């Protein structure tokens, strides 16, 4: 069947539903066979819980759904507890960069409905798009669409949206996600860069993604009020560029970067090392 789809439609990968119940030997054989069809053919599986490393390895799947991070993100913001997110990232550090990350999908209540504070949508997506993993945006998420499943129906999670409505649905979140997508595409640190925790409290969180001679630092604030963060910078550098604020320059003094974050917001900062 996979060979038919490759030969007929030139597909580059497949998503395996309920991969947690598939036979491991079958997945190993599938990996071997698809590699002969296309060297870079991608296999991604839906796995709700368990040791993700059992599925994600050189012999089976390239990626699985990171439901653990999904839960940590919405509850970490709702409970003002960034420790939950940071703990999850540390625990999955060995394979986290290969996992498929999300805050919405076709089986889960919309993140805009799960969050108690709707203003958290901006830092939630800033977090998703810069933490280790392969981030995804479920359609409608870019407009902050709400939706909850019921015991008998999931239709609210999958509304029909006319292209004629796109312009009227556009909002601040739409522009933020668009900018985050460009940032993710253009900065290799966010692809497979090493993660390093820099600052952590219940309501503020900063982490770095390492490149060879550069860093991306993400700073997040889940408090309603603005917060001043003094972030240690693990690289010799004199300034940082705020990628979400049209290239605003921030000085680095004595190895620390000071930034003021608005309530319920975040920043993505690019730092290039000094030779």
Name each model-derived stretch.
Residues 95-116:
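Active-site clefts of carbohydrate-active enzymes
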Residues 13-15, 42-45, 100-102, 129, ...:
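Structural recognition of the beta-strand scaffold that forms the well-ordered cores
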Residues 124-126, 130:
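Hydrophobic targeting/anchoring helices
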Residues 1-9:
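An active-site-proximal structural segment forming one wall of the substrate-binding cleft
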Residues 7, 17-95, 99, 118, ...:
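Active-site-proximal helices and loops of the catalytic beta/alpha 8
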Residues 11, 61, 133-134:
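A structural motif
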Residues 13-19, 111-112:
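Short catalytic-loop micro-motif centered on adjacent basic/acidic residues
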Residues 137, 141-275:
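Carbohydrate-interacting/catalytic domains
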């Amino acid at each position: 069947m996979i060979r038919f789809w490759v030969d007929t439609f030139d597909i580059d990968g497949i998503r395996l539903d309920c991969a947690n119940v598939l036979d491991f030997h079958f997945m190993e054989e599938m990996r071997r066979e698809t590699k002969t069809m296309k060297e870079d053919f991608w296999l991604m599986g839906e796995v709700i819980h368990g040791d993700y490393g059992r599925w994600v390895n050189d012999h089976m799947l390239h990626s699985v759904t990171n439901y653990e991070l999904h839960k940590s993100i919405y509850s970490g913001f709702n409970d003002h507890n960034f420790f939950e997110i940071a703990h999850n990232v540390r625990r999955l550090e060995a394979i986290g960069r290969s996992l498929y990350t999300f805050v919405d999908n076709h089986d889960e209540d919309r993140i805009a409905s799960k969050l108690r504070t709707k203003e958290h949508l901006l830092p939630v997506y800033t977090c998703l798009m810069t933490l280790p993993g392969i981030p995804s945006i479920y359609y409608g998420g870019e407009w902050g669409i709400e939706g909850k499943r019921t015991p008998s129906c999931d239709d609210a999670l999958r509304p029909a949206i006319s292209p004629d409505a796109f312009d009227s649905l556009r909002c601040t979140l739409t522009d933020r996600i668009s900018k985050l997508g460009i940032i993710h595409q253009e900065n290799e640190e966010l692809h497979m860069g090493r993660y390093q925790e820099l600052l952590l409290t219940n309501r503020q969180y900063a982490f770095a993604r390492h490149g060879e001679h550069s860093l991306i630092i993400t700073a997040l604030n889940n408090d309603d009020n603005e917060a001043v963060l003094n972030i240690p910078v693990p690289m010799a550098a004199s300034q940082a560029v705020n990628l979400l604020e049209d290239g605003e320059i921030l000085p680095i003094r004595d190895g620390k970067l000071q930034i003021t974050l608005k309530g319920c917001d975040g920043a993505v900062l690019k730092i290039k090392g000094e030779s």
